[in-house]
């Protein structure tokens, strides 16, 4: 592990990408401490608890929401917009489906629409959030209670989201890994210690016999270890489909090529968890504009993973998004065509259409196992808060840890691939 990190910094180009990414994250972190104009940050000094959606925004935004900073909306509107756009591409909007098949040009068009939708959502949600928080804090948040003040705050928060989207693009282009994922990763890491401290304080408050509190702490540590091991297993597990070659191959060529087709048990990674959590924010937005309406509150309660209905919906969403994104990441038809062109085949399966059907069947089975495993791992922290009386930050913290592990694994793989590529080029140049 240490040697791997050393290798990252030995390669100049990779080292520069790491430093660039860190510089962008420093800018992100500084922004989480700059309050939006016209607000009183001291209004949050005496928090009265928060809901799951609020905790999610705060966690993904690196604590920016509870400071009501310029990055208070974070990157969540972009995630929500991405979900909507992915769904609309499924022949719901023919033009989007057409763009999705146009390669790089089509992807650029879809990305632009996603950004416009994200900025629109950020503006709508920021207005509602300003009203909700000001009411929640009994008018102590907004200094000047005027329409112009609310509009100014909404514009600044929307600009903050737009800047974070741009920041993510810069990291993707010039830094390490996927920029949006890296920003979420950094935001979660910066709030995770506070969640653990809150848990420690809650566990020992009012406890004459501290043995029960220490038992809770031990239980949390064991749970975190099991969650980490389980997450790594489900994210890294691979099914190897054997491959044979129709043409004669020399021993040398066979030795240089993989004789199997690797399919991940969970090809979607942690994206389904991020999407499922962000999806809950859509119905909860109604409470921002209709805080006193009973029907809006009922919808919001159903969209809370802590409620019985919300927990079932959360599990179903994770499973559905896992299937959906697995087939976005893995294209059985393209795989079958590539195997046929290379003169290779799966033993006992005809090349072409039969191979496509076989890969699809295997992917369905693997994704079923992966989605159930992912749902179980995601639901455990929620059950812990529900039945052990733990603070809600642990619920978000458990899900966040899963996201952190997934992003860390993908980023490490990206770095290793870049180092290997540089070493290969260096070897070829000598």
Swiss-Prot record:
Family matches, as Gene3D superfamilies: SecY subunit domain
Family to which the UniProt record says this protein belongs: Belongs to the SecY/SEC61-alpha family.
Full protein name: Protein translocase subunit SecY
Ranges that cross the membrane: 18-38, 68-88, 117-137, 147-167, 179-199, 217-237, 269-289, 308-328, 368-388, 389-409
Highest taxon in the source lineage: Bacteria
The protein's assembly and partners: Component of the Sec protein translocase complex. Heterotrimer consisting of SecY, SecE and SecG subunits. The heterotrimers can form oligomers, although 1 heterotrimer is thought to be able to translocate proteins. Interacts with the ribosome. Interacts with SecDF, and other proteins may be involved. Interacts with SecA.
Known role: The central subunit of the protein translocation channel SecYEG. Consists of two halves formed by TMs 1-5 and 6-10. These two domains form a lateral gate at the front which open onto the bilayer between TMs 2 and 7, and are clamped together by SecE at the back. The channel is closed by both a pore ring composed of hydrophobic SecY resides and a short helix (helix 2A) on the extracellular side of the membrane which forms a plug. The plug probably moves laterally to allow the channel to open. The ring and the pore may move independently.
InterPro entries for the chain: SecY, SecY/SEC61-alpha, SecY_CS, SecY_dom_sf
Record-level GO BP terms: protein transport by the Sec complex; SRP-dependent cotranslational protein targeting to membrane, translocation
Keywords for the protein's UniProt record, in alphabetical order: Cell membrane, Membrane, Protein transport, Translocation, Transmembrane, Transmembrane helix, Transport
GO cellular component terms listed in the entry, alphabetical order: cell envelope Sec protein transport complex; plasma membrane
Subcellular location: Cell membrane
Entry-linked SUPFAM superfamilies: Preprotein translocase SecY subunit (SSF103491)
Gene Ontology MF, one: protein transmembrane transporter activity
Pfam families: SecY
Membrane topology, record value: Multi-pass membrane protein
């Amino acid at each position: 592990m240490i040697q791997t990190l050393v290798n990252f910094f030995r390669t100049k180009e990779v080292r520069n990408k790491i430093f660039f990414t860190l510089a962008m994250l420093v800018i992100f972190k500084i922004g989480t401490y700059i309050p939006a104009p016209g607000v009183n940050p001291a209004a949050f000094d005496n928090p009265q608890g928060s809901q799951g959606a609020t905790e999610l925004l705060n966690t993904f935004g690196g604590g920016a929401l509870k400071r009501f900073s310029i990055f208070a909306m974070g990157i969540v509107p972009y995630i929500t917009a991405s979900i909507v756009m992915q769904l609309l591409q499924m022949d719901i909007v023919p033009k989007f489906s057409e763009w999705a098949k146009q390669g790089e040009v089509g992807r650029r068009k879809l990305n632009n629409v996603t950004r416009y939708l994200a900025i629109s959502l950020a503006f709508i949600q920021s207005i509602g959030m300003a009203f909700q928080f000001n009411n929640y804090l009994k008018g102590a948040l907004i200094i000047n209670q005027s329409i112009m003040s609310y509009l100014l705050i909404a514009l600044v928060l929307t600009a903050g989201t737009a800047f974070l989207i741009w920041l993510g693009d810069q990291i993707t282009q010039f830094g390490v890994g996927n920029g949006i994922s890296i920003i979420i990763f950094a935001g979660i890491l910066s709030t995770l210690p506070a969640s653990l401290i809150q848990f420690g304080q809650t566990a020992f408050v009012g406890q004459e016999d501290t043995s029960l509190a220490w038992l809770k702490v031990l239980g949390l540590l064991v749970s975190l270890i099991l969650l980490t091991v389980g997450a790594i297993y489900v994210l890294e597990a691979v099914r190897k489909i054997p491959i044979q070659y129709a043409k004669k191959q020399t021993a040398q060529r066979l030795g240089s090529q993989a004789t199997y087709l690797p399919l991940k048990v969970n090809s979607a990674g942690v994206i389904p968890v991020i999407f499922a959590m962000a999806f809950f924010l859509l119905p909860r937005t109604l409470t921002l504009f209709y805080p006193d309406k009973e029907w809006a509150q009922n919808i919001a309660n159903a969209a809370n993973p802590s409620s019985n209905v919300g927990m079932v919906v959360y599990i179903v969403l994770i499973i559905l998004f896992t299937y959906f994104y697995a087939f976005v990441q893995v294209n059985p038809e393209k795989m079958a065509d590539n195997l046929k062109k290379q003169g290779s085949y799966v033993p006992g399966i005809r090349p072409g259409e039969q191979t496509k059907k076989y890969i699809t069947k295997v992917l369905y089975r693997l994704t079923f196992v992966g989605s159930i495993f992912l749902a179980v791992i995601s639901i455990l922290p929620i059950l812990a808060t529900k039945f052990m009386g733990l603070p809600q930050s642990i619920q978000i913290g458990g899900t966040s840890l899963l996201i952190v592990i997934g992003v860390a694994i993908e980023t490490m793989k990206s770095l290793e691939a870049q180092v290997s590529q540089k070493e290969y080029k260096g070897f070829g140049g000598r």
